[in-house]
Amino acid sequence: MTTLNSTPRADGFHMPAEWAPQTQVWMVWPERPDNWRLGGKPAQAAHVAIAKAIARFEPVTVAVSAAQYDNARARLDMPNIRVVEMSSNDAWVRDSGPTFVINDRGELRGVNWEFNAWGGFDGGLYAPWNLDSQVGSKVLEIERCPRYATQGFVLEGGSIHVDGEGTLITTEECLLNRNRNPHLTREQIEAVLSDYLAVDKIIWLPDGLFNDETDGHVDNFCCYIRPGEVLLAWTDDPEDPNYPRCHAALSILENTRDAQGRAFIVHKMPIPGPLFATEEECAGVDQVHGSQERNPSVRLAGSYVNFLIVNGGIIAPSFDDPMDEKAREILQKLFPEHEVVMAPGRELLLGGGNIHCLTQQQPAPFKA
């Protein structure tokens, strides 16, 4: 694998929007018993459902440990799903995996960020994370894809959304957190994002969703649906702790323009719940020092915004919640050219994330 000493912007590469054509989606098999209950078996069943839903639209590659390879291969019994052996600490490939960039000559490259399990030893969710920190480079190695190294810059893919036309949305809660890149100022962080993703304007929302243990990833709160239009998690309940977060984000979005000078159209997505884990669900998680504790009194950061756009499809989470059907209707209205598939999201939420967090799209390069 070639490691490049330049930057994507300098070489004419950029991160495309999620709705751009894709060649495949990457996933990593869940099995960590101190994060996934009952040794990961319920989460694996949800993983299979999601992988098969995606595979209806495009190929899927699932990275699996040697110990779980036979089990995963047997369950992922579709021709469009490839299973490869890869060591990892957990399954969050949106955050541990690479960010792919393309140019207008049909070339694909990858950006390899530093991963510290959402905070390292200052609020991180587990240790060690050394295997996860290798996932990005291993994915690029498998794809024979040249790699940009970011010299220790900590970033998770779930903390950013781009429109492919020069604008990036993120949250201060995450990117300015002291446990990510405390040695860098906001301006220095913006410069890195500009160089490695080729964005010209960065929109900073104050916070993500309440109790999001990633420190407020934007992909669980606000996402692009097309250039100039975003979908924002929303509540009208003043007693909901998400209420001030939603309104603060809306104020920012309504009073700014994107890199192309467009005012934002903001669509609202109701927040499910409030959702909580049961005592039985929490009891099924191994208790290990240094790993995130699961507690039935702590509200879960459930969100329908945590969906994945694939070629011709939208794969979105359902929570056995009365709001599920409303969420599906909203997504179908916003994406009339796509088929909306609701997939089981509760087991993923119990582990700390959802469909977008557990997937990483690989764009299809094209010649202009």
From Swiss-Prot:
Catalytic activity, reaction form: agmatine + H2O = N-carbamoylputrescine + NH4(+)
Group of enzyme by EC: hydrolase
Keyword Methyltransferase in annotation: no
Active site (catalytic residues): C357 (amidino-cysteine intermediate)
Keyword Ion transport set for record: no
Keyword list, A-Z: Hydrolase, Polyamine biosynthesis
A molecular function (GO) term: agmatine deiminase activity
Signal peptide: none
InterPro entries assigned: Agmatine_deiminase (IPR017754), Peptidyl-Arg-deiminase_porph (IPR007466)
Coiled-coil residue windows: none
Biological process annotations from GO: putrescine biosynthetic process from arginine
Pathway annotation from the record: Amine and polyamine biosynthesis; putrescine biosynthesis via agmatine pathway; N-carbamoylputrescine from agmatine: step 1/1
Enzyme Commission designation: 3.5.3.12
Recorded superkingdom: Bacteria
Subunit structure: Homodimer.
Family: Belongs to the agmatine deiminase family.
Function: Mediates the hydrolysis of agmatine into N-carbamoylputrescine in the arginine decarboxylase (ADC) pathway of putrescine biosynthesis, a basic polyamine.
Entry protein name: Agmatine deiminase
Organism expressing this protein natively: Pseudomonas syringae pv. tomato (strain ATCC BAA-871 / DC3000)
Gene name, Swiss-Prot/TrEMBL: aguA
